[in-house]
Design a protein with these regions (language model features):
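Residue-level detector of functionally pivotal "anchor" positions at catalytic/ligand-binding pockets or at interdomain
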Residues: 455-482
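Short, surface-exposed loop/turn motifs with a glycine/proline- and acidic-biased composition
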Residues: 477-499
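A recurrent domain-boundary module in secreted/ectodomain proteins
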Residues: 438-460
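Structural signature of tandem-repeat unit edges
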Residues: 27-33, 51-59, 77-102, 107-120, ...
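C-terminal tail/sorting-segment detector
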Residues: 1, 7, 492-506
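Terminal processing/anchoring signals of secreted or surface-associated proteins
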Residues: 53, 291, 436, 459-464, ...
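Bacterial Sec-dependent N-terminal signal peptides
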Residues: 1-27
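Consensus positions within tandem repeat domains that build extended binding/scaffold surfaces
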Residues: 123-126, 146-151, 169-174, 192-195, ...
Length: 506
């Protein structure tokens, strides 16, 4: 009997709670004939209880402030109300200039107010910080979405961007942490910096057919950690600084047909395993997932999340681009092309390389080219480069650096060889020992790391000539399938010197 009574009591409590929820979930539709009058159409009791609101007719800054308060946020950052509004439909509304300021930004001791400055403009900070908003449908007549319009709307999962919008401003949707999908209409011609920065839940971005955007600006999708794929319009020519950085779920990327330029750190810390280039691109090419210039004489982008621990640079390559191998942690060994002359800044920075041999034709090593390669212990130069730039080997594990030939001491720059090791041994031709010591000291290239400069012996040269002959290039299983690591049984291993070795792995 007691159990029955308890169950009935629980059911009654649940029913009461449900009634309360339903009572609080209020919907309202309002049609205005004059901007600034929304508050006259909604009672004080309704203001903080309405959860779904549809507005038609003209609205201005005064109405936007009222809507913000209904959505739990006042006219400054981190100021809240008791509002419960989660769903806002403005498709039949028209934004008109004028009315009160709906948002204030502190600048020193002063405050700057923001309101609706133009017709059909979702202006600066319009819904910024409205953390309770879940869905927003903008006026069908909207032409622009200005800077910070939805910044920090942490619960926003959906925003319908009208087909009339031609611009999305800086940080417009930045830190909308719940936004899962976004559709960019064909009308959008420009997007500002960091437009979708740190939208951590964003999985897909769809650009409508006909979208003619030409630039993906700096930080646009930086920190979109769930973004799995994106197909850019073929009109995109440029990718900005950190545009797709820290996108930890993005593993493949296709460069558009019009693509012509990118910043060196566009994909920083993004685990790309394969790059492709859209058909029709006349400036770039992709071979086995690696990006080169059109005639494959310069290697520009290596997919840093590849599991292979070795890579052979094609024989025709004469240059390695900025940050080409940046952060390639799995890469332990690399065989460079004998035609290679230039290695640009940060080309191999923070990679997993353990040793490196530079062909005789290499003339310059760029700034921070190998910085942060903590596993790198040995560097061998078959010739004498003309210059080694600032911090080229900064923070590596180098213990031995060998110069096989040296017509003149390279131009050494500050901290070029400053490492985590206590001592670095430099081997140089005997007639260059004193000059090389002076060069290291004058440029402050090593200090405070200790170093010794020793004459190169015949045995050192012989060892150098053998360098790389035993480097593994690729590996296959017994069925002829390429593998990234040893597997049990027969392994067929191709070496850098052209030899093929059969190994039995246990």
């Amino acid at each position: 009997m007691l159990q029955i009574f308890t169950n009935k009591k629980n059911i009654a409590l649940m029913a009461f709670a449900l009634m309360c929820i339903m009572a609080n979930a209020q919907q309202k539709s309002v049609t205005l004939t004059q901007a600034g009058t929304l508050s006259s159409q909604i009672t004080a009791e309704e203001k903080f209880n309405i959860t779904e609101l549809s507005v038609a007719g003209p609205i201005n800054g005064t109405d936007i402030l009222f809507i913000r308060q209904m959505a739990g946020t006042d006219n400054e950052a981190n100021t809240s109300t008791n509002g419960k509004l989660t769903h806002l439909n403005l498709q039949a509304a028209n934004l008109v200039s004028g009315g009160d300021s709906y948002y204030f930004v502190k600048k020193g001791t002063a405050k700057k107010g923001y309101g609706v400055s133009e017709n059909n403009l979702v202006d600066h900070y319009m819904f910024s910080g409205c953390e309770k908003l879940v869905e927003v449908k903008l006026p069908a007549s909207t032409q622009k979405i200005n800077n910070y319009a939805f910044f920090g709307c942490k619960s926003l999962t959906s925003c319908v961007i009208p087909a009339s919008v031609d611009h999305i401003g800086d940080n417009a949707f930045a830190q909308c942490e719940a936004l899962k999908n976004i559709q960019i209409p064909a009308s959008v011609a420009t997007m500002g910096n960091a437009a979708f920065n740190k939208c951590a839940a964003l999985e897909t971005i769809t650009f409508d057919d006909g979208c003619a955007i030409t630039i993906i600006n700096a930080n646009t999708f930086n920190g979109c950690t769930l973004l799995k794929g994106v197909k850019l319009p073929s009109t995109v020519e440029e990718l900005g600084k950190l545009a797709f950085a820290n996108c930890s779920s993005l593993t493949a990327f296709t460069l558009p047909a019009s693509f012509a330029d990118k910043e060196s750190d566009t994909f920083q810390n993004t685990p790309i395993k394969n790059y492709d280039v859209e058909e029709g691109n006349e400036g770039f090419s992709a071979v086995d997932g690696v990006v080169y210039n059109e005639d494959t004489t310069e290697l520009l982008l290596y997919p840093i999340a590849r599991e292979e621990n070795s890579f052979t640079v094609p024989t025709q390559v004469g240059g390695i681009g900025e940050q080409a191998f940046f952060g390639a942690k799995s890469l332990k060994q690399i065989t460079l092309s004998n035609k290679l002359t230039n290695i640009l800044s940060k080309a191999f920075a923070q990679s997993g390389l353990t040793e490196i041999t530079f062909p005789a034709e290499v003339t310059s090593i760029g700034k921070e080219a190998f910085s942060g390669c903590k596993a790198l212990t040995t560097a061998t130069f078959k010739g004498g480069p003309s210059g080694i730039s600032e911090k080229a080997f900064f923070g590596t594990g180098l213990t031995t650096v060998t110069f096989n030939q040296m017509n003149a001491v390279p131009e050494l720059h500050q901290q070029a060889f400053l490492t985590a090791r206590t001592t670095i041994n430099f081997f140089v031709p005997a007639d260059k020992v004193d000059a090389f010591k002076q060069g290291l000291t004058a440029a402050n290239a090593v200090s405070p790391t200790r170093f010794e400069v020793k004459p190169l012996t015949t045995s050192s040269i012989y060892g150098l000539q053998q360098e790389g002959s035993a480097v593994e290039v690729s590996r296959f299983n017994a069925a002829g399938q390429r593998i990234s690591a040893p597997v049990r049984g027969l392994n067929i291993v191709k070496m850098a010197n052209g030899k093929v070795v059969k190994r039995i792995e246990k």
